[in-house]
Design a protein with these regions (language model features):
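A glycine- and charged-residue-rich anion-binding loop/surface
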Residues: 1-229
Length: 229
């Protein structure tokens, strides 16, 4: 069990082969000394519970003896690998159970987490093979959920189709982004672009060289909008 293992990162115990694969494909590994100090105080960094997340990052970094920038530089890429692991496992369970990605309802959530995981992979140069991830998850889960192994091929096919749609959406997005960054973009516009075009605020921020800011609670607001529909 994680609590008695003495390790700071539970993903390394709950999905070891998947995480090992992601470390290899990204060329990154966690700084265990930093993570051992960070994990006990990381609960303060819930964006839905604080008014100024950057201030909390700074105070958290000071508490454990790091600069804010150094802490973020370590935490963001590694936590993105764990997000990819978590999202892909969720997709295996959901798709094996018969759900499908779509632009509405629960299917919207599945499409969103797939695309978020791909965005993380692209941002941090992870050489990601989603089919391999699905195989690793099914293998690790086989003792508890042997039925998942029977669905691996069908899940891989669904995700290959999603990858084609994702790639096409990025091509279209680039054309739209080049026009959008010349205009004023408020939070409502960011939400509209994400919902209708799949354009993330991170893409707009990067293209505008930081002029367009990413709201810290953006994805919470996206989820809230869809819960109300």
């Amino acid at each position: 069990p994680w609590l008695t293992s003495g390790k700071p990162i539970n993903f390394e115990l709950t999905m070891p082969q998947t995480v090992k694969y992601l470390y290899k494909q990204s060329g990154r590994k966690p700084d265990l000394d930093l993570w051992t100090k960070f994990v006990p105080v990381s609960g303060n960094l819930n964006v839905d519970e604080v008014d100024d997340i950057e201030k909390i990052w700074a105070s958290t970094a000071r508490k454990i003896g790091y600069s804010k920038n150094k802490l973020k530089k370590e935490i963001y890429p590694i936590s993105s690998l764990y997000a990819i692991a978590d999202h892909s496992r969720t997709l295996l369970f959901a798709l094996a159970d018969g759900a499908l990605p779509s632009n509405s309802g629960g299917g919207y959530n599945l499409r969103s987490i797939y695309r978020r995981s791909m965005d993380f992979a692209n941002k941090y140069n992870v050489k990601l093979d989603y089919s391999k991830l699905i195989e690793l998850h099914a293998k690790e889960l086989k003792p508890q959920y042997p039925e998942l192994s029977k669905s691996v091929k069908s899940v891989q096919e669904i995700l290959k189709a999603e990858e084609r749609k994702y790639t096409q959406s990025k091509i279209v997005s680039k054309r739209i982004i080049s026009k959008i960054i010349k205009t004023t973009v408020d939070e409502n516009k960011l939400l509209e672009l994400y919902d209708s075009k799949g354009i993330t605020p991170e893409e707009l921020s990067e293209a505008s060289k930081g002029k367009i800011k990413v709201p810290s609670d953006f994805y919470l607001k996206v989820a809230s909008r869809h819960e109300k529909r």
